[in-house]
Amino acid sequence: MQHPREENSIVVELEPSLATFIKQGFNNLVKWPLLNIGIVLSNTSTAVNEEWLTAVEHIPTMKIFYKHIHKILTREMGFLVYLKRSQSERDNYITLYDFDYYIIDKDTNSVTMVDKPTELKETLLHVFQEYRLKSSQTIELIAFSSGTVINEDIVSKLTFLDVEVFNREYNNVKTIIDPDFVFRSPFIVISPMGKLTFFVEVYSWFDFKSCFKDIIDFLEGALIANIHNHMIKVGDCDETVSSYNPESGMLFVNDLMTMNIVNFFGCNSRLESYHRFDMTKVDVELFIKALSDACKKILSASNRL
């Protein structure tokens, strides 16, 4: 019998500055939203609202919304979870399977329920106190992925709950919800001495290799776009930005992208420091080709899992 969850690592050997570039890009660009926009609609349990919202915020949703990874990373889509559960003598606990899961199309604000794997029944979230017939405990809550704009249009699509209650409770808490995009990285990534390593979790109910490819494809596209948009000031060196003086041959390095790219072409630079370097050695298209080849190598390694 296949275990529902396995920890694995994907390892590739790369030129050290390129490995560092990919690792830093992953950590800065691959942002999976947390469920930080949480609203408790009803709660007679012994856990206070803040405890529920903290637990729900960190639900590992990527293993549920795996069919929509690319559009969630590009923020074309968001998602929400909804829980309405009452304690009974027979069922005295809550698992992740008790939630309903919905994908949100940000263009239309359409809300569509997604299938949930039965394996979620094995992930316990809360245990009620001892059951008493006259004081059964209940909880109802909803939580949206970070970055979701709560407006009348999207609220009108929440046909599974009492909109009046939602509006009242949302108005009570909206001022304390973090307006910034709150996220986590899908995996831990390290790159000691060019040994780029992804520490991943593989689940039995979906094709991890396909999902991992979606993530790497997104990362490659985002990195290439950033490379094309990146500028180094030419002229007198300015310590507020990366800059290069062609007359003196001095380069001031003030950002990670500049550092990694020039190091790939033989410089031994560090952040916030001056280096004598011939910038004509830098071939951006050659670096992009090396990046694309590295991404192919990463995907090839993932296929061996």
From Swiss-Prot:
Gene Ontology molecular function:
DNA binding; DNA-directed RNA polymerase activity
GO annotation, cellular component aspect: DNA-directed RNA polymerase complex; virion component
- Reaction(s) catalysed by this chain's protein: RNA(n) + a ribonucleoside 5'-triphosphate = RNA(n+1) + diphosphate
UniProt KW DNA-binding keyword: no
**Can you tell which superkingdom this protein's organism belongs to?**
Viruses
Q: What is its EC number?
A: 2.7.7.6
Which residues pair up as cystines? none
> Where does it localize?
Virion
Cite the entry's keywords alphabetically.
DNA-directed RNA polymerase, Nucleotidyltransferase, Phosphoprotein, Transcription, Transferase, Virion
Does the keyword Calcium feature in the UniProt annotation?
A: no
Q: Which InterPro entries match?
A: DNA-dir_RNA_pol_35kDa_poxviral
Pfam families the UniProt entry points to: Pox_RNA_pol_35
Record's subunit section? The DNA-dependent RNA polymerase used for intermediate and late genes expression consists of eight subunits 147 kDa, 133 kDa, 35 kDa, 30 kDa, 22 kDa, 19 kDa, 18 kDa and 7 kDa totalling more than 500 kDa in mass. The same holoenzyme, with the addition of the transcription-specificity factor RAP94, is used for early gene expression.
What is the protein's known function? Part of the DNA-dependent RNA polymerase which catalyzes the transcription of viral DNA into RNA using the four ribonucleoside triphosphates as substrates. Responsible for the transcription of early, intermediate and late genes. DNA-dependent RNA polymerase associates with the early transcription factor (ETF), itself composed of D6 and A7, thereby allowing the early genes transcription. Late transcription, and probably also intermediate transcription, require newly synthesized RNA polymerase.
| Name of this chain's protein | DNA-directed RNA polymerase 35 kDa subunit
Could you tell me which species this protein originates from? Vaccinia virus (strain Copenhagen)
Question: Which gene name belongs to this protein?
Answer: OPG156
